[in-house]
């Protein structure tokens, strides 16, 4: 039984789009800068631009740093694509540091970007504790800071949350509802009839992973309470890190531990662990026996929904860092101010697909083309904070279709 979901967000997942990316160096602590394009030059995606960029504003002295786990894996490269497009449209520089979600590299990345002259930084950290150092570095250097794909827990990290709120330079966080995401995904499996579910995490203690895990468990618990004669089980997690090899080994371990395994949830980690898990299931000849759901759209998701190697996926959220980028940009420009005593919390929706037809609608507006034109990106940069939050909340296939005139 297929579910129809109304939640949506924007992401680019086409292999053709990914091919246009220029890698930002290899390894977990690499760095690269994309400058505002000069007159009659080519931007990173190959489009011709003018010195003033699409906005007509000369922002060439603005540099925004991006601290990200990877700018070259499936999800990270999608994020880089939209951020590079926004930088091109606004005529600003953007510099990336890949930190691999290794705590010491996460904190060092903020120091590196501040030292490089960035006036603002957006960060996808691994754990809340890293934000203590990140906030201090930004306070000391008078650099604006916003999170993407992450939010400091007011409940579990009260002191860090308060430090963020007290800061004159910490703006806020753009993030998804991960417990809800986890519950939606496990429900796809339960409604398909799967009852023995294996779980693959990426990094122990990662706040996003813990939120998704909470949702998986809640979904199974609710199912078992409502269906006492048809109970499901959820394994303890195997950890894969953020590599394809890790995902493959984790899937192999789960299949070996439970011969009756009929579903896998590679929880995330940028897309590479999922690819490894799929490959392991295919090698074992169990593609038709084990349903797989995950988060972070793959470039070939449509094909995988067709051939059964994927049962469903949540994703389409690569525009999350775009919102953080716009927050920092406006802070640098002086349009957003007076951050001390405030914490700007910006929820961002997921898109769920569990059939080829679901994916076709998504593909039309987010794979075959970018979800925003340069003109629309410039218009977004002029929104108030409240209007930017509203724009984030309504990102959807329907919204993109409407803006495209369909």
Please state what every model-predicted region is.
Residues 2-7, 17, 24-406:
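A residue-level marker of the well-folded mature domains of exported/periplasmic proteins
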Residues 12-16:
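Repetitive helical segments and hydrophobic/amphipathic motifs
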């Amino acid at each position: 039984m297929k579910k129809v979901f109304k939640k949506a967000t924007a992401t680019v997942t086409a292999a053709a789009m990914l091919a246009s990316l220029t890698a930002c160096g290899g390894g977990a602590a690499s760095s690269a800068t994309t400058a505002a394009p000069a007159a009659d030059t080519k931007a990173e995606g190959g489009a011709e631009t003018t010195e003033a960029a699409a906005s007509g504003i000369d922002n060439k002295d603005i540099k925004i740093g991006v601290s990200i786990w990877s700018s070259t894996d499936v999800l990270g490269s999608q994020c880089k694509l939209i951020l590079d497009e926004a930088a091109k449209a606004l005529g600003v520089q953007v510099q990336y540091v890949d930190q691999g979600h290794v705590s010491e590299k996460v904190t060092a990345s903020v120091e590196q970007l501040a030292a490089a002259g960035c006036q603002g930084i957006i960060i996808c950290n691994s754990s809340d504790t890293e934000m203590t150092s990140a906030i201090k570095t930004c306070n000391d250097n008078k650099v604006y800071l916003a999170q993407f794909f992450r939010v400091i827990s007011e409940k579990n990290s009260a002191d860090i949350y308060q430090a963020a709120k007290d800061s004159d330079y910490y703006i806020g966080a753009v993030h998804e509802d991960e417990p809800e995401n986890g519950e939606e995904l496990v429900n796809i499996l339960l409604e398909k009839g799967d009852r023995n579910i294996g779980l693959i995490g990426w990094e122990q203690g990662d706040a996003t992973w813990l939120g998704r895990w909470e949702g998986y468990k809640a979904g199974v618990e609710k199912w078992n309470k409502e269906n006492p004669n048809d109970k499901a089980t959820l394994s303890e997690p195997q950890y894969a890190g953020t590599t394809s090899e890790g995902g493959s080994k984790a899937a192999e371990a789960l299949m070996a531990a439970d011969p009756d395994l009929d579903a896998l949830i590679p929880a995330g980690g940028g897309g590479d662990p999922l690819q490894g898990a799929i490959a392991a299931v295919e090698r074992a000849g169990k593609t038709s026996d084990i349903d797989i759901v995950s988060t972070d759209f793959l470039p070939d998701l449509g094909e995988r929904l067709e051939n059964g190697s994927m049962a469903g996926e949540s994703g389409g959220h690569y525009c999350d860092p775009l919102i953080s980028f716009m927050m920092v940009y406006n802070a640098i420009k002086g349009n957003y101010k007076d951050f001390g005593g405030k914490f700007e919390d910006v929820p961002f929706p997921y898109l769920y697909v569990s059939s080829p037809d679901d994916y076709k609608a998504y593909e039309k507006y987010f794979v075959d083309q970018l979800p925003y034109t340069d003109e629309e990106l410039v218009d977004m940069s002029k929104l108030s904070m409240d209007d930017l939050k509203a724009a984030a909340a309504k990102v959807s296939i329907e919204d993109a279709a409407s803006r495209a005139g369909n």
